[in-house]
Curated annotation (Swiss-Prot):
One of its GO terms (molecular function) is large ribosomal subunit rRNA binding. One or more lysine residues are methylated. Pfam families: Ribosomal_L11, Ribosomal_L11_N. PANTHER family: 60S RIBOSOMAL PROTEIN L12, LARGE RIBOSOMAL SUBUNIT PROTEIN UL11M. Forms part of the ribosomal stalk which helps the ribosome interact with GTP-bound translation factors. InterPro entries: Ribosomal_uL11, Ribosomal_uL11_bac-typ, Ribosomal_uL11_C, Ribosomal_uL11_C_sf, Ribosomal_uL11_CS, Ribosomal_uL11_N, Ribosomal_uL11_N_sf. Coiled coil: none annotated. This is Large ribosomal subunit protein uL11. Keywords: Methylation, Ribonucleoprotein, Ribosomal protein, RNA-binding, rRNA-binding. Part of the ribosomal stalk of the 50S ribosomal subunit. Interacts with L10 and the large rRNA to form the base of the stalk. L10 forms an elongated spine to which L12 dimers bind in a sequential fashion forming a multimeric L10(L12)X complex. Belongs to the universal ribosomal protein uL11 family. One of its GO terms (biological process) is translation. GO terms for cellular component: cytosolic large ribosomal subunit.
Length: 142
């Protein structure tokens, strides 16, 4: 018989840097999850990723206070900012452009994000990422 799910927690935690301080501690503490157990498991799983990159994680908490978690790829906005070499996107994306990304960079990001995107193929994934880039005030070249 399957365990009964008591809650799902969605967080964004830096790769290899989960610790009991907010936002991780309070979110898990409310559901009665062993915080240190999660932190150790998360840090072990994300140890090979780039340190400090934000990793969305979905934690499923069960009735017996056990948990499972699934990590996703870093947000497209983080990858785009890194590719363009900027700190933040534009406050006015249609009038104020803050950087440039090439089609090759978009393809690279789309390949990395492919497991999390609902796009039918790589071309559709690239178009999705290009739309995100334009909405951040980046110019897409190519």
């Amino acid at each position: 018989m399957a365990k009964k799910v008591t809650g799902i927690i969605k967080l964004q935690v830096a790769a290899g840097a989960a610790n009991p301080s907010p936002p991780v501690g309070p979110a898990l503490g409310q559901k009665g999850v062993n915080i240190m157990e999660f932190c150790k498991a998360f840090n072990a799983k994300t140890g090979d990723m780039e340190k400090g990159s934000p990793v969305p994680v979905e934690i499923t908490v069960y009735e017996d206070r056990s948990f499972t978690f699934e990590t996703k790829t870093s947000p497209a906005s983080y990858m785009l900012k890194k590719a363009a070499g900027i700190k933040s996107g534009s406050g006015r994306p249609n009038t104020e452009k803050v950087g440039k990304v090439t089609l090759a960079q978009l393809e690279e990001i789309a390949k990395a994000k492919e497991p999390d995107l609902t796009a039918a193929d790589l071309e559709a994934a690239v178009r999705t990422i290009a739309g995100s880039a334009r909405s951040m005030g980046l110019v897409v070249e190519g």
